[in-house]
Structure formats: C-alpha cells, structure tokens
Amino acid sequence: MRQGGGGGERMVSVLFLLLIHLALCQAKCVMTECDGEEDSNHPPCKTNKSTYLPITVTRSLNPTYMARFEKYCSYLVQEEDKAQVCCTELQLKGMTDRISNAATILGSCPSCFDNFAKLWCQFTCSPDQSKFMKVMETTGPKNVVVKMEFKVNRDFVEGLYESCRHTWFANGLALRLMSLGGKVSFENFYGFMGTKNLAQSIPINTEFQFSRMKNAMNIPTTPCHKSAGPKVPACGAIDCPTNAHQLVDISKVEHLGTKVFHPHFPDFEWLLKICGCLALTVLLVFILKYSCHRRSAPNGEDGCYVDLGKGNLEVQFEGLCARYANAVIKHPLIFVSLGLIVAAACCSGNFKFHSLTHSVDQVSAADGETRRNEKKFIHSFGPNHRIEQIFINLPPTTKSMFNMPLFEEMFQLVGNIQNLTACYGNSSVKLDDICYKPIGKNHGCAIMSPTNYFQNKWTNFENAGPPTIDDEIFDDQHWEHLKYCIRNPLTVSTYSEMSCFGEFSGPIDPILVFGGSNESIKGAEMYYTARTIMITVLIRGPEDQAIAWETAFLNMMSRYEMKHANFTFMTETSVAEEIHTAVETDKIVSVIACAAVLIWVITMLGINHWPESSILSALVHHKLLISISAVMISVISVWCSIGMFSLFGVHATDNAIVVLFFVITCLGINRIFVIIRTFQANGHCYGLPNISYREMNHRISNVMRRSIPIVLTNSLICSTCLFLAGGVLPYVSVSMPAVEVFARHAGLAILMDTAFYLLVMLPLFQYDARREMSGKCEIWPWYELSNESKINLCMEAVDGNLRSPVDWFKLAIAPLLLKKICRIWIATFFFVSLIIACYCTLCLEFGFNQVMAFSETSYLTKHFQNMNENLNIGPPLWFVVEGDVKWHDPKMQNKFCTLAGCDDNSMGNKIRSLAYAENYKGNYLHGDVNIWLDSYLQFMHPRGSCCKMDGKQFCDPSNATHCSSCSSSSVASLTTTEYEFYRNLHHFLETPPSIQCAHGGMALAKPAINLTRNGKIQSAYFSTFFKKLNLSDSIQLYDAWRFAKYLADDIERELEIPGVKVYVYSTFFPYYEQYLTLSTTVYTLVVLVLFVAFVTISLFLRVNLAGSLVTVFVLLSSYLHLMEWMYLLGITVNVVSVINMAMSLGIAVEFFGQMLHGFYNSKKPKREERAFAALVSNGSTTLSGIFPAIMITAGCLSFADSRVLITYFCNQLVGIGLVCAVHGVVYMPTLLAIFGSDFYQNVSSEEESTDEAELQDTPPSTTSSTSSTSETSV
C-alpha cells in the first residue's frame, strides 16, 4: 500500500513540476508601446513585468485591429476570429505604415514582399518574442528600447535575401535603397535594417543574430518563383531571374558593317535587271547607230533599215549644231537678249529663297520612315526637351572633384544661369519662364548638376555636415551628404537631414552628372573618381523665347571663365549657328576661288604675242571679255538654278550654295576652253589683211559645229549624273535632302550654264573672234595690228614658230604615245593600278564624323569630343504603341507590364531585360526603363499607399489615413471596368511622386500617354536609353537604330493585336536612315551613269561601238581609282561623298569626251597618230582648262573653316582632278592607240559639204591661211 501510495505522490510531484516548467517556459512579450505616447513611429518600451503575456484580439471586439493585422500578418491568425499578439494597436499601426512604405520598393515581387512582411510581423507582433528577442539597451525612465537582439534562423534570412536581391525599383535594384552605402549584399541589407534611421522609419537599432539553433525565429519563406498565396502570382521575369526567361534573339538584326562593297553586294535579281537593261541598251544603240540610212553604195542599194535622213545620227546632230551656229552668227543680239531674259526670269525666284537651317531637314527625307515616326511622336507627345549642356573638366593638378573652391564656382555658375535674363521683343525671358518642371509650375527647374543635390543653394552646402566625429575621415564635412546622395539618389533625408532630391523635387542620377570615372571601381563609388562634371539644363518653353534665352546663354558662356576648371558647352541652337558662322567665312573663300579661277582663265585662254612695240598689240589675242563672261555666266547659272527651285519651294543649304559656285565654274570654264582651243588649234584666230566676212563666218561656224556637240554631250552626261543622284527619275534617292537638293541644283545649273553658253557665250565668241581675226585690241578697239604684223603672224603659225602656253605638252608628252614600249608600259601600269584600285575599293568603309561639320577651333568640336569621352549613357529611346488597345483588360495589361503575373515575353519584360542585361552581344540598350503601366498598377495596388478613396472622392496620398484602397484586387493586374480604369488613370497622372506615393505618374507617366479628347489612350510610349554610343561612329549609330527597329518589329509581332503598331523613335534616327540604301545607291548610280554615257556618246559623237566601250571602261576605272584615292586619304563613304563620286563621273566625261571627239575626228591614217593628234589638241585643252580650275578651286577650299568642305570637297576634288586627268590624258589615248580604229569615216553633213563647196569658190588669198594652218596643232 505504501509503495503504491508513494509512487502516486511522486507522479503528482512530477506533473506539478512540469506544469511549473511549462509556465516558466511560456513565451512572453519583451516590448510594448510606451505609456502616454500617441506617435506610432515612437520606439517601443521594454515590458515592465516579467510575466507580460501576449494579448488576445478577436474579430468581434477588435474589427479595425484585425483588418489591419491581417493585411500583412494573416499567417499569425490561428483561428478565424482571434489571434495571440504582442503588439498594441499603436504598434501595429506603426508597423503597417512602415511595411506599406516598403511595399513601394519591394511590392513588384509579391514573394519578396511577403517574406519581408513576415520578418517584421515576427519582430513586432509575434507571441513568441521572448524566445528569439532580447532587449539589449534602454534609455529614460520609461525604458525606451534603444537596441534589440533578434535571433533569426539562417535559412529564413537567406531565403528572404535571395527572394529580394533581384527585385527592381525605379530602374535599379530595390535593395540598393535598403543596403548600407547603397551596396547590395547580405550583410549590408541586414545591417541597414538593423541601424536606427528615423528618416528611413527605423526607430531602433537591431542586432541580428544568425544561427540554426532551435530558439532562433524560423518560419517558411517563399522563393521568388513561387506564389506567396492564393491568387497571388509569383514574381515577374525581371525580379526573379531563376525563372526561365529567354532574352530576345537579336542575331538576325541587320548590321551595316564597315565595308561598303563586300557585305552588301546587290542580290541576283538586281544583277539580272541590270544585265537586261545593258543588253537592251546595246541593242537600241546598235539599231539607231548602224541601221540608219547612209550614203548609197556604188550599186545603189541601201545598207540599213531606218531612214533618219542623210548621214549618221551623229552627223545629223552636227548638222543641227551647224545650223544653230549660222543662226547665232546672223542674229547674235536676239540670242543674247533671249539669254538675258531667261536669266532675269530665273533669278527672280531668289526673292523666295531661304536656306535649309534645321539640321534634320538637311539630312533626312520628309517622307522617310524615321521622319514620319518623328512627326507622329512630336504630334502625340510634344517636342523633346531642348538641352543646354556644360561639361566641367578638372585640370590634372586637381586630385579630386571634392574640392571646395571648385564647388563654390559651380554654385556661382548655376546661379548665374538661373538669373540669366534675355531680351525677347519688348519683354524679358528668364530660365524659370521656359525651363522644364516635371512636378509642376510650383517646383524648380530640372537642372542635372551636383549642386542640385543641395537644391542649388550654397547655404545648404555649407550646412551639410557629418553626424558623428567618426565621419571626419572624409576630406571635408560637406562631402558626406554628396557621397550619400551619389550612393542613394532616392534618399529623402541623409544624415545631414537634407534631401538628395533636386529643387525640382526629383532625383538626380549620378550617371547623368559625373563622367570620366575610373570604371575599374564597381558600384556608385566609381563616381567619386569623376574627372568631368556635367551640368544639363532642360528647356520646354516656347521655341522663340527658348532661342532668345539660348543666345544670351551662349554670349555669357563664351565670356565666362573658371579659375579651378576648364569647361565646354553647347545649346540646342549651337549646331545651326556654328554651321552658319562657318558658311559666312566660307563665302569669302568662294569669292577668292572664283577670282583665282578668273585670273587663271585670263592667263591661259589667250595667246601671248607681242608683235608690235605697243603694249596694246599684246592684248589682241587675249580673251578678257570671254574669260570674265564665262565666270559671270557660271555664277548667274547658279543663281538661276537656285531661283527656279526657290519658286517651287525647294531650298538648298548655305554650304551647298558655296560648293555650287566652285563646281559650276569649273565645268563652265571647260566649255570656253573647248571652243577657244578649237578656234586656236585650227589657226582660225589669225587673219590676213584682206580676210572676207564670209571667211570669218565660215571659220566661226566650223568651230561652233565642232565644239557644240561635245559641249552638249558632256553637259547631258554630267547633268544626268547629278540629277540621278538628286532623285530625279529614274529615281535614285540617297535619303538626304541637303545632298539631293545640292545634286538637283548642280544638275540644273549645268543645264542653265549650257543654255547660256548657247545663247550668250556663242554670240560673244563670234564677236570676239571677228575682232581677233581683224587684229583689233580687246580693251581699245580703235587699235588694230598692221597688215605686215597680220601676215607675219600667219606665216609664223604656218611654220610652227608661234608658241602657246600648252605647246610643251605637244613637244614633251604627246610624242611618247608614238613609242610602242611606252604604250605597253602605260597599259601594264594601268591594269596593275586597276587591280589595286579594286582591292582598295573593297576596303572602303562607311562613316561620317559629325564633328567635321565644325571647324577645328570651334567650341562645339571640343564639346563633342568631351561628350564622346565622358558621357556614361546614350540617347533616350522611345517605344511607341499606337492603336486601339484595351488597356483596362488584365489580359491586355499582361502583354505590356513587367510585374508579377505579367507575361514573360511582355513588351516591358523584353525592353527591361535587354536594358539590364550585361555582356549580351549585339545589345544596344542600357540604363533606366520607364514602364508607365507598371507604375500605374503599383499605384493601384491595394497594399500600397497611393490610390485611396473616401467614398467617390480621391484622397491625397499625403493625407489618406481615413481613406480606403481604390482596388480590391490583390494581384498586379487591375480587374476593373473601362470607366474605373480611366477614372483612376486621371488621378494617377495628376499625382506627383512623393514619399507617401513614389508611383505618382505626373513626372514620368503623364508625358508618356497621349489621350484623345474623350480621355482614352490613343498612344503611349515605354522609354529607356541606349548604351554609350560613339557620336563620331556613324556605323554604330546606324546599327543602334536598326537594332531598335528590329526590337520594335519583334514586339509588334509578339503582341498580335490587330490594328496596333509599335515604332521606335530617338532624336538621332533621321540622321542615319541614309545608310539603309546607300550601298545599292552606289551601285545603281554607277551603272545608270555608265549607261547614260554609253548611249549619249554612241549616238551623238562620231564614235564606233569599240570607242564607246573603251570610254565606259575608262569611266569605270576612274571611278574605282577615285575610291582608291578616298581609301588612301581615309575619306569614308556617305551621302556627301557618294554625290561627289557621281559628280566625278560627270567631270570625267569632260576629260574623256574631248579626247574621244578628237580621236574620231582626226584625219590621220593610223590610230597611233590619231591618238597623238587628239592628245595634242584636246589633252592640252584639258590640262590648261578644267584640270587647273579644279585644282585651284580645291586649293581655295583648303582654307575653308568647315572640315566637311575640306575633306569631302577639297580632298575629293583633288582626287577627282588627278584621277580624271591621268585617265583622260594618259590612259584614254593609250587605250585608243591600242584598240581604236585605223581609219577616218569621212561622212559629212549637208552644212559641212556646203561649206567645203563654198570654200572652193573662195579666192586663194583668203583660203591660204585656213589651209596652211588647219593642221598646225598636229
């Protein structure tokens, strides 16, 4: 009995002890609200009772508490109607407010946010606080907690960190805002949350203890790729890289490549068309040339099929020219009057002329794709900001940008800019009147500058200081705030209790402010080493007022000096103004060039004889009138071309006009040299004392008959070259209006110059020829050579004793052609050089350095170099969605957004993933991404603090404690009606971003949405940036455009929304669309010009088919050698050089046409002698006429300020002159001597036969001079 009873007593004792132990081990609360405090953000107090147990709350008694509690801590509700908690209602309110603020940062990833909320629910409200929490330090009589110890299982903290470390917020990692120093790491993340910071709503210090002991807090975490609860989606592809997400395949993007001819050779279809055109052309020429009615054969049979009259087509053409010459001789005043009337009528259009000043109008066709997109973008969203920039470069002697004198100067500079006043009409304009204010008119201007981290106030800079003595390790106390803002630009209050936001109430990304940093340093600390400080002022006021202010800004900055740094600057109008300034300087060069050419023409056009003692006798055979008239007519031709185009609203650039005078003067001079040299070479310029009027007419008519065909043929080919390049049918567009307009103006100017040659120069020539044959002085017509002097000159001409400035050519150069060994060496060298030229052509590269538009001494040249070296990011890029999109439909929203629940291949995910991708080959995106729909969805999120309603009244987020959420949905997409969607969208667009609501859409979303009149979204854009692009590398800029276009097309295809289009726009796109078809343009231009040359020469000159083919071959060779010249001088291929390349073919015809005409009109029996005769008569004309005119023009252009003129006109003109001269004077006669015909086809027109018959009736005294001097040149 006792034993049994004793055992029962022991059992009771054990149970009693167990109950006591359980009572002692029961969890308790370790902190609670402080007595008398009503501030929910006040630190808690330590519990006064060691037995402070959790409190029980029920739904029936505490409905408000339970509603707030379940918002973030629903997992702690053990039963449906009650929960055990350690937090009072005041503590709960403070915790939910702090978690709501975190929802703004972490809310895009529900799993991350859920884990984060669990951590602080456990910390604040867990009924098991005493198991894993311990008060380490208190203060005051109320035992206000200063420091807590929080034991957390490592599995939980690692799970929380891993679920959040890839979450993005405001175009950066969210944890960047929740990590010490802005450096995202496990330790910095928990170090930040454990460090007291009232500005960040962290009321106490917390020492996190990480362990895997059983007493450490440990509850399950949700990985980012899993759902945190029913109807809650997993994190999106951007926030959770563990999800399988494939970047857009960009391997199919078309790149320009560096080589012009290798990767972009035309396709087979293009070649087939060209071959077909070639075959048809040859057939047509053969029919017209060789199937016309010739003179009857001895048997009386005709040897052809098409009756075009007596003689070959070219002979008929010469006959027409002869009849025109006779008309000019008979009625010179009528033709001159007609020419003056035409000139006056055409020049009258100059009253409507104004030059192209807007750069985009010069480089991109108005109907091009990029221009159409630009017009749509500006029409939908308004013009882009005008940008004013200042780059401040630290001198080598300055070790760091953290320099007090430097910042003092910067504050002064920014202050001067803000206070700068410009005159505008009768009023004044200040920066505050026109600057961009993203948050509204009541806020400051958007100035991206380091000084704006201090709100551009020197007093704020002086008052900024470190909070503790430990921070004195910095160079100066003022730099702590700046460095903190560089690390965390979204910080609203630093240790100095100052905001990092600028005076425009927005953040300043250090990537836009600091340049020239040491890129080997990772993270935001890289910007501490910046050697360049960038100040950017954004303007979005009326254009006229903005231009007035920019003019004042330029005047101020051009005189401004800084003692402790160097700087460069530019404004939106700088490019146009600097180009205009350079053109004004180049106009002087143009005048000098025309004067130099005129002096050369006066010197070389006449013959230097001094037959009598009077100085006036030396001026008998000079050509002052012809020389001056030729230059003046070329100038008038340019003005006529400009006037005619101006009448139809087609205007050229100032640079184009300057170059036009050079080109047309050179070509016009050549025409005069052709007729004058023909006149001189046949001995017609010398007249006997008794020369008859009919003999004079015969000589003049004969010269005109022989020179007009070659002038017209050359003009036709040259103008055709330019018209083709200028987009005249057959259309060969180079997609650059300034160059196309230049080509059209030049083509028309050549035709006008030819017309004035026929209407004005020929009558003047016949007058001057009569004067010269009569032996009269040009400037004093009353002086006349004696009969003895006239006879002596004629006799000396017959004996070959008279010398002209080009006789050295006849004596030294031309005889080499008669030597077979010389011809072999020349031909061999020609073909070897042709092979080398082909190789160099294949190495020719695309490109255009836009800095070359300015002189080397221009302030813009230095600034562009500064931008290339120091910019950290490229231009902005906009992806525009236009069409009928049902934005209120959640399924449709998922096609565009990047939040949890959105499609992995949504538009936003594609853009954002590429913008954040690193080392992805071929990717051009980098930097911040603005997805307005994401901001709107987060603005509407029920857990957020943005969209709140009080009944039907929208609540200001800064005062919305009494309001309820606009949305009852717990997912990212909005399940609302269309009416509710647009009602809330209006509130969203009018809400500025703030501490209480970071997702307000006024700053970034409002400019991105284009609404119709009834408030529906008509179009909207998502924006990002390009990576850093080389502004001097046009190939890279072109490839960036093609990449963006490919991405937009891919997005549009993936959306599969009928009627919805996606296009891209960036400010530089219109400048590089030209390269899209440039390769094909080069091929097509060459082929078409060669066809035109072949047809024209074959039909209108006395040339057989072999001669035409030789000419075309030499033309092609000259083209290839010109590209070799370009390669050797580093001249890249672009629309400017392509126009010059097309023009070179036209100029080459001026060289080759004369040689060909001279060869096939020579009566020598052998082809070597005929080539010799052509070289003597026509080669000297070329080397004394157009060739020196080109070289003189190029020499004058070398003094121009514009490097575009120097590179693409001066250097290229030198190449054109040298290549054409060598081909026309060396290669052409050599090939004709080898492959040309051995006979002269003596077919005469009716006029030629009539002239010969008339000469037979002429007395011997008058014909002797003609017959004796007809071959003096050969």
UniProtKB/Swiss-Prot annotation:
InterPro entries: HMGCR/SNAP/NPC1-like_SSD (IPR053958), NPC1_MLD (IPR053956), NPC1_N (IPR032190), SSD (IPR000731). It is a multi-pass membrane protein. Residues 1258-1274 have a biased composition (Low complexity). Residues 1245-1274 are annotated as: Disordered. Residues 1-27 form the signal peptide. The keyword Glycoprotein applies. Disulfide bonds join 29-86, 34-45, 73-121, 87-125, 109-235, 112-164, 224-240, 435-445, 485-500, 897-902, 946-997, 947-966, 955-963. GO terms for biological process: cholesterol homeostasis; cholesterol transport; dauer larval development; intestinal cholesterol absorption; sterol transport; vulval development. Disruption phenotype: Both ncr-1 single mutant and ncr-1 and ncr-2 double mutants exhibit slow embryonic and larval development, and hyperactive egg-laying behavior (egg-laying constitutive (egl-c) phenotype). Ncr-1 and ncr-2 double mutants inappropriately and transiently form dauer larvae under favorable conditions (dauer-constitutive (daf-c) phenotype). Belongs to the patched family. The keyword Nucleotide-binding does not apply. One of its GO terms (molecular function) is cholesterol binding. This is NPC intracellular cholesterol transporter 1 homolog 2. Involved in the uptake or utilization of cholesterol. Ncr-1 and ncr-2 act redundantly to prevent dauer larva formation under favorable growth conditions, and are required for the normal functioning of ADF, ASI and ASG neurons. Residues 1245-1255 have a biased composition (Acidic residues). Keywords: Developmental protein, Disulfide bond, Glycoprotein, Lipid transport, Membrane, Signal, Transmembrane, Transmembrane helix, Transport. It is found in: Membrane. GO terms for cellular component: plasma membrane. It comes from the Eukaryota. Residues 586-767 form the SSD domain. Its main location: membrane. The chain crosses the membrane at residues 268-288, 327-347, 588-608, 630-650, 656-676, 722-742, 745-765, 824-844, 1079-1101, 1106-1128, 1138-1160, 1172-1194, 1204-1226. It holds the Pfam family NPC1_MLD. It catalyses: cholesterol(in) = cholesterol(out).
